[in-house]
Amino acid sequence: MDLIEDVKAALRASRRGATVLNLGVFDTFPELAGRLFAQISGNVAVGSTVQSVYAADATLVEITTYDIAETARRNFEPGGAAATLLFARGAHAVMAHRVAHKIWADGDTTLALAIKTSCARVLSNDIHPAAKIGAGFWLDHGLGFVAGETSVIEEDVSIWHNVTLGSTLNTGGAVAIRTLAQAL
């Protein structure tokens, strides 16, 4: 079974849960991601943007599904990748960032910041759209996580919460930590 079929099976197993999530009908990852983010953000335009960005970039879908698989593998919660996609706040934050980063890289910085801000309000983290994050990133709950514009997180990195990258909170002296490597 693939991720979409696993999510459908989980929703069929709990009609009340499916009603609360209110995701409707979906057949592809971009459709599911769009519906999920419309619910998370409370904004249909955010969901539509998420769906269109994923629909236009198969590599982004591949990286995101790898993030989800790695989160499910490293996390201690039951339910596998389907539950991770539906319920993991950290995975949602990484997905929102990946969409905002793609939009930023394509030159629409206002839309990228709007997506970032809309999602950050409900996910309790702040990841600048210019921050570079490698595949396989596991952000546990993501609460209090901040990554500044110059942050670089390499592949297969795990972070729990209350971490700030890219600031020293002063005007001189210490150098900000901006890059996290796999071994950390």
What is each PLM-predicted segment?
Residues 1-118:
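Terminal amphipathic alpha-helical/low-complexity segments used for targeting or macromolecular assembly
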